[in-house]
């Protein structure tokens, strides 16, 4: 029997800030529906993930000493620069995707620069949720290569054909994001 492909979404703390949590939850849900095994890995959890998504409490010491080899997943999908220090201190044995959601303050910008300086060449693929994110990355780190992978939308939950009582005015604009200066 063929082994089920697997992906772990990694953050420092779950639930995380702003839209990260929704992105991670719906990525896991969508991948599960496609037949993948998914989990959310974090150093601490303040809540359980929805949709029966597996939760993995990560061990900082183990990651720092053995790298990502101890994680029983085919792909490691990091959603924050700060977790890269643990995931990539030891040469990775499994591919690591870094999902850039933007840096909203100087501390996050500085952390991103340091993480990229140290680990950029160990990351298999860097993706961003928008071209604004890629532009911000390139302002912070000149020689960086990334691709846009837009946030997915569950069309059963979010759809344009809502009954009239839910629609106010014309035209309709659905905006789901955090207002950040770099998004202009």
Per-range role (PLM):
Residues 17-18, 155, 180-184:
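A short, basic/aromatic alpha-helical/loop segment that forms part
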Residues 132, 152:
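Carbohydrate-associated surface elements
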Residues 166-183:
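Conserved donor-binding/catalytic core segment of Leloir-type glycosyltransferases
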């Amino acid at each position: 029997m063929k082994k089920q492909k697997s992906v772990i979404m990694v953050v420092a703390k779950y639930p995380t800030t702003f839209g990260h949590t929704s992105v991670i939850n719906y990525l896991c849900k969508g991948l599960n529906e496609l037949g993948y095994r998914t989990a959310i890995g974090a150093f601490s959890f303040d809540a359980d993930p929805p949709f029966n998504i597996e939760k993995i409490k990560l061990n900082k010491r183990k990651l720092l000493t053995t790298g990502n080899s101890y994680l029983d997943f085919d792909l490691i999908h990091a959603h924050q620069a700060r977790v890269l220090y643990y995931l990539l201190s030891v040469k990775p044995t499994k591919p690591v995707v870094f999902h850039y959601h933007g840096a909203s303050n100087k501390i996050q910008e500085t952390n991103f620069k340091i993480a990229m300086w140290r680990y950029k060449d160990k990351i298999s693929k860097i993706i961003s949720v928008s071209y604004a994110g890629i532009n911000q990355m390139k302002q912070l780190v000149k020689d960086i290569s990334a691709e846009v992978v837009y946030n997915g939308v569950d069309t059963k939950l979010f759809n344009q054909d809502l009954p009239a009582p839910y629609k106010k005015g014309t035209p309709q604009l659905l905006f789901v994001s955090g207002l950040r200066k770099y998004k202009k």
